């Protein structure tokens, strides 16, 4: 996929054909925001989470994007007129900057999608509006999707390393692209609005740091434990949980080491937290496609046992889907994410009644995964 890196300009009032431009401030009602965004200052909304996006329709050949990035480590994709094969990539610099949009636009109406590629660890970005040619304004945005989907996950869901070469390391933020994660692809396939709550290295019982998903999922600002998201602001039809990969690597570092019953109980508790926020959503408990789903792994069985328990308690609106392990030792690359999305799209779409059932995709389910001591 071709990519163009957009270099920042100094924040200036720009001139186009001798006429000063106009800034369309962030509180304009024709912006369409998606994801967990801090609107405490409507003229300076703050974006943290991977997959956060802003849509707009504008008129004219001039487009500049004004951002204030905290650390100069965040990356954004800019898509014009739904050309998803040729993104312009903004590599943020720290502070307030104006970034040029693509050259060669016609003077017609265009659609814009600004999409956060990187996860919250790169720091927040404040959106300060768009600069257009003098006399131009935002038009009415595309209709918001009727369907809504939300993901909770780890580095796989973030898209960590998905654009890295096969032989390379997969920890560079320039090579993390949430737009090409299985999660975002699945949302687009299903024509659903997308929300992504994910952090590389996180688990349910243990993470690579002193924070676990039960202490993270509810946050608006990911770095502030007192910052609480208002779940009433976004009610997904489907919630996909893809966690336990990091737990599978780290569980023996806990003292005492949890037994199978404790692991299942922790998963039940977390799914209960999600259910308490989304009473009507269908919850999909997934795992993979890294080695937590390899042959002989107990981790899919823990999830199956948790779901059996939830159903026995009366929660029938819950499903299981496992991504088969591909015998790949690194984070999934884009091709792996596409395969994951293909299967998940079919499974979720059928279960939600969004696509016809052609019986070509089923959850990867095996009784051999069930732990012996449950």
For the regions a language model picked out, list residue spans one by one.
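Hydrophobic h-region of N-terminal signal peptides that target proteins for export
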Residues: 10-18
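Conserved beta-strand scaffold positions in the cores of enzyme catalytic domains, especially
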Residues: 151, 194-196, 320-322
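N-terminal secretory targeting modules
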Residues: 19-152, 157-175, 352-374
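Conserved hydrophobic/aromatic pocket- or pore-lining residues that grip, position, or stack substrates
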Residues: 154, 186, 274
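Bacterial N-terminal signal peptides that target proteins for export
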Residues: 1-7
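Conserved SGNH/GDSL esterase-like catalytic core that processes O-acyl groups on lipids
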Residues: 49-51, 117-124, 162, 167-257, ...
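Alpha-helical cap/lid subdomain in secreted, periplasmic
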Residues: 218-365, 369-370
């Amino acid at each position: 996929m071709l990519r163009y890196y957009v270099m920042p300009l100094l924040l200036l009032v720009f001139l186009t054909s001798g006429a000063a431009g106009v800034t369309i401030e962030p509180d304009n009602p024709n912006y369409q925001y998606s994801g967990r965004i801090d609107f405490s200052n409507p003229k300076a909304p703050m974006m943290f989470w991977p997959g956060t996006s802003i849509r707009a329709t504008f008129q004219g050949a001039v487009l500049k994007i004004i951002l204030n990035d905290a650390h100069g480590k965040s990356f954004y994709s800019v898509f014009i007129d739904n050309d998803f094969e040729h993104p312009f990539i903004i590599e943020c610099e720290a502070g307030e900057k104006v970034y040029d949009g693509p050259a060669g636009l016609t003077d017609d109406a265009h659609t814009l999608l600004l999409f956060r590629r990187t996860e919250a660890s790169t720091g927040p970005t404040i959106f300060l509006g768009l600069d257009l040619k003098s006399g131009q304004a935002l038009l009415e945005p595309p209709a918001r999707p009727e369907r809504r989907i939300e993901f909770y996950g780890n580095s796989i869901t973030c898209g960590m390393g998905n654009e890295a070469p096969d032989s390379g390391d997969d920890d560079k933020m320039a090579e993390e692209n949430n737009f090409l994660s299985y999660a975002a692809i699945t949302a687009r396939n299903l024509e659903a609005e997308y929300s992504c709550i994910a952090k590389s290295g996180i688990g349910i019982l243990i993470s690579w740091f002193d924070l676990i998903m039960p202490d993270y999922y509810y946050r608006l600002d990911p770095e502030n434990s007192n910052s609480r998201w208002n779940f009433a602001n976004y009610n997904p039809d489907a919630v996909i949980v893809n966690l336990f990969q990091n737990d599978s690597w780290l569980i023996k570092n806990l003292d005492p080491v949890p037994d199978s019953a404790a692991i299942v109980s922790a998963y039940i508790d977390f799914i209960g937290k999600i259910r308490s926020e989304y009473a009507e959503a269908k919850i999909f408990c997934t795992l993979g496609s890294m080695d937590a789903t390899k042959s002989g792994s107990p981790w899919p069985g823990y999830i199956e046992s948790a779901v059996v328990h939830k159903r026995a308690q009366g929660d029938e609106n819950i499903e299981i889907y496992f991504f088969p392990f591909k015998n790949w030792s690194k984070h999934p690359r884009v091709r792996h994410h596409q395969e994951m999305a293909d299967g998940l799209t079919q499974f979720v779409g059928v279960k939600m009644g969004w696509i016809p059932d052609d019986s070509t995709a089923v959850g990867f389910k095996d009784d051999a995964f069930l732990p012996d001591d449950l």
